[in-house]
Swiss-Prot record:
Pfam families with a match to the protein in the record: SBP_bac_3 (PF00497), SLT (PF01464)
Organism: Pseudomonas aeruginosa (strain ATCC 15692 / DSM 22644 / CIP 104116 / JCM 14847 / LMG 12228 / 1C / PRS 101 / PAO1)
Protein's UniProt name: Membrane-bound lytic murein transglycosylase F
The UniProt record lists the keyword Cell wall biogenesis/degradation: yes
Annotated catalysed reactions: Exolytic cleavage of the (1->4)-beta-glycosidic linkage between N-acetylmuramic acid (MurNAc) and N-acetylglucosamine (GlcNAc) residues in peptidoglycan, from either the reducing or the non-reducing ends of the peptidoglycan chains, with concomitant formation of a 1,6-anhydrobond in the MurNAc residue
Feature: compositional bias, Basic and acidic residues: 479-490
Signal peptide: 1-32
Region: Non-LT domain, residue numbers: 33-269
Active site per database record: 316
Location (main, coarse): membrane
Length: 490
């Protein structure tokens, strides 16, 4: 009887211990942190991306790029630090994203695809782009999908463009194309530009950011409807981080953050055209080296990026020290007599003096702007004032404020500047008529030149990206450049 009771007690103890163990295991499983909680606990948001002008790169001032800026804002929303990781190619990006302990998300100009891949999910879209077939100027232009048959075509391996071509091949079995994981969009455009391949397929935003580096490339036709870019997150049923991402992107769209980033990175592209891009490429080789040291010296003295000063000089005179306009402004920085005297310039035709004087003048204008105007808008406002004068710029700011816009944001004020040339508007201003539309173009051009100079001079540029052009833009005869006098009438 006692033995039976002891046996029952042992069984009860075993069952109790087992129950406690299972209960603890269940509690442990229930308390496993979500993806969002892990990010917040670690204090770091790990984001994987691609190294390209349209996504992420480093310049003199550090990390930058559309995707970087957007991811940085998201990290700030979460109250954590942003850590950027770069992938060698798209397959590598998705592989790292799906591995255990990998990055929290991918922000790399991705279009949702890979429907059969359960290891990845996509957020709400935030930027509409159009896939485009790219060909080389001077070659026969394809106008329809069947024209791709028989052409040398290369696209990024693992991209949505490769999926599009795979679908097209079902309709045209003779279609041939190559997928490569050893190149980036920049490389594909270069290969079309120099004739190594006949065609490629890229998104419209990538082309917009890169076309000026490759002035021979052209759009053949849009390959399908516009699609939205999205962030990618690891697959699974944990929606905590995904919900936060979607809420952030929706708010960024509603509150204008996405529009401001689009303006910053894409709002000033496509302003040069083929002739302007090709000419600038030549002048980078033939003219800038003569004056680069002067720009760098002024930039160092004034604590300003020398490439922005050089961009102003190019917009003003095409880097021609003897340039003269009908209004009497002269020299590489096109200074008036009054400005030259105020800046201590005794000879406007001396390139060193002109660069020093013009640079000093620009920095002075920027320093005198209201403190409420922050960078990068502050530099764009300074460019506008450099061109049109501070008084007219103030008229445009007041006009923006009356319209319910932000007088401290370039995106808003640039909408008002063209009104200064319309009587119904300038009649109500303090300083009257001004060619405000020209000022908008001036700022757009300087920003574009500045972007190009920033990209081609950045120290981290990799061998497969631009380096083959020897830090000069491709599409230019590098062996026998045509010399120019450097002095032309404007």
């Amino acid at each position: 009887m006692f033995a039976l009771t002891a046996y029952r007690l042992r069984c009860a103890a075993w069952l109790l211990a087992t129950g406690i163990f299972l209960l603890l295991a269940g509690c442990s499983e229930a308390k496993a942190p979500t993806a969002l909680e892990r990010v917040q606990k670690e204090g770091v948001l790990r984001v994987i991306t691609r190294n390209s002008p349209a996504t992420y790169f480093q310049d003199r001032n550090g990390e930058t790029g559309f995707e970087y800026e957007l991811a940085k804002r998201f990290a700030e929303r979460l109250g954590v630090e942003l850590k950027i990781e770069t992938a060698d190619n798209l397959d590598d990006l998705y592989a790292q994203l799906s591995r255990e302990g990998g990055p929290a998300l991918a922000a790399a100009g991705l279009t949702p695809g890979r429907e059969d891949d359960a290891s990845v999910r996509y957020s709400h879209t935030y930027l509409d782009v159009t896939p485009q077939i790219i060909y080389r100027n001077g070659q026969q232009r394809p106008t329809r999908p069947e024209d791709l048959v028989g052409k040398r075509i290369m696209v990024l391996k693992g991209s949505s463009h490769a999926e599009q071509l795979a679908e097209l091949k079902k309709q045209y079995p003779e279609l041939k194309y190559e997928e490569s994981d050893a190149v980036e969009v920049v490389d594909l455009l270069r290969m079309v530009d120099v004739g190594d391949i006949d065609l490629t397929l890229v998104d419209s935003n990538e082309l917009a950011m890169n076309q000026v580096y490759f002035p021979n490339v052209r759009v053949a036709f849009d390959f399908g409807e516009a699609r939205g870019l999205a962030w990618a997150l690891p697959g699974g049923d944990d929606d905590s981080l995904m919900n936060e991402v979607n809420a952030f992107l929706d708010q960024a769209k509603k509150e204008g953050l996405l529009q401001r980033l689009k303006d910053r990175y894409y709002g000033h592209v496509d302003v040069l055209g083929y002739v302007g891009a090709y000419t600038f490429a030549q002048h980078l080789q033939q003219r800038l080296p003569r004056y680069e040291s002067h720009f760098k010296q002024s930039g160092k003295q004034l604590d300003t990026d020398w490439r922005l000063l050089a961009a102003i000089g190019y917009q003003e005179s095409l880097w021609q020290p003897g340039a003269t306009s009908k209004t009497g402004v002269r020299g590489l920085m096109m200074l008036t007599n009054r400005t030259a005297q105020a800046m201590g310039v005794s000879n406007r035709l001396d390139p060193k003096q002109s660069i020093q004087g013009g640079s000093k003048y620009f920095v002075q204008i920027r320093s005198e702007l209201p403190e409420s105007i922050k960078e990068p808008d502050r530099s764009w406002f300074a460019l506008a004032a450099y061109n049109i004068g501070g008084a007219h710029l103030e008229d445009a700011r007041k006009m923006a404020e009356k319209e319910g816009l932000n007088p401290n944001k370039w995106l808003d004020v640039k909408k008002m500047l063209p009104r200064l040339a319309q009587k119904q508007w300038y009649a109500k201003t303090r300083y009257g008529y001004a060619r405000g539309g020209e000022t908008v173009h001036f700022v757009q051009n300087v920003r574009r030149y500045y972007d190009i100079l920033t990209w081609v001079t950045q120290p981290q540029m990799e061998g497969s990206q631009i380096a083959e052009s020897g830090l000069h833009l491709p599409g230019v005869n590098k062996t026998r450049p045509e010399e120019d006098s450097g002095d032309e009438k404007l």
